[in-house]
UniProtKB/Swiss-Prot annotation:
It catalyses: S-ubiquitinyl-[E2 ubiquitin-conjugating enzyme]-L-cysteine + [acceptor protein]-L-lysine = [E2 ubiquitin-conjugating enzyme]-L-cysteine + N(6)-ubiquitinyl-[acceptor protein]-L-lysine. One of its GO terms (molecular function) is zinc ion binding. InterPro entries: B30.2/SPRY_sf (IPR043136), Neuralized (IPR037962), NHR_dom (IPR006573), Znf_RING (IPR001841), Znf_RING/FYVE/PHD (IPR013083). Residues 17-174 form the NHR domain. This is E3 ubiquitin-protein ligase NEURL3. Keywords: Cytoplasm, Immunity, Innate immunity, Metal-binding, Transferase, Ubl conjugation pathway, Zinc, Zinc-finger. It is an enzyme of class 2 (transferase).
Amino acid sequence: MGSLLSPEANAEVPREALSFHGNATGAQVHLDDQRSTARRRSTFHDGIVFSQRPVWPGERVALRVLRHEEGWCGGLRVGFTRLDPAQVAASCLPPFVCPDLEEQSPTWAALLPEGFVRAGNVVCFWVNRRGWLFAKVNAGRPLLLRKDVLVQGAPLWAVMDVYGTTKAIELLDPKANAWIRSGEPVPESEVISGEECVICFHNTANTRLMPCGHSHFCGSCAWHIFKDTARCPICRWQIEEVAVVSSLKAEEGS
């Protein structure tokens, strides 16, 4: 499945620019010639794509949402997998990364809040050495998506699901500044997304869903979620308790 990666040495190793793997794609995925853009042709599923090479702990995967399509529920999923796409037949890929691919392989992915995957938004995601999966949108603060990625013992490839309202995405160079729109103010809800509720974008996020620990919701929205589905909208874990907290901080790490 490829050589093991040493997190301690990753800073010194030159990295090939990320692109999408050319063969292991969902049944509805169309890639451009450079394998930097992935578009879902139709339906709302079968949009799984992988990076063409393993990704280091702490390495950022940056992408832009090119097209948003109304009429579906839910959007882009991002995460990491130990599944080597070079060993995967496209015809064997399931329709969804969550939960299908997660159940079939060592894969850890999460749904991004719909408000963060509008057309033009830049999404950056990564996993740190503790196995914590983070995502950041535009100039916003990091969101902790989950804390259970296994980073030791085998390489990890980035995996994305061009699902639902997300119709097309483009991989970007996270070290380049060309996609940072200088001079344009970032909407307040994005800058302080770690402090405002990611559902209503109005009230302060002051609750923590247990046991997953996600803390991006105000009390009113959290209790509506608990009553309606009892599942975290970010990681889909079962909610057993809604805890009210006075101060919320997530350790980003690298």
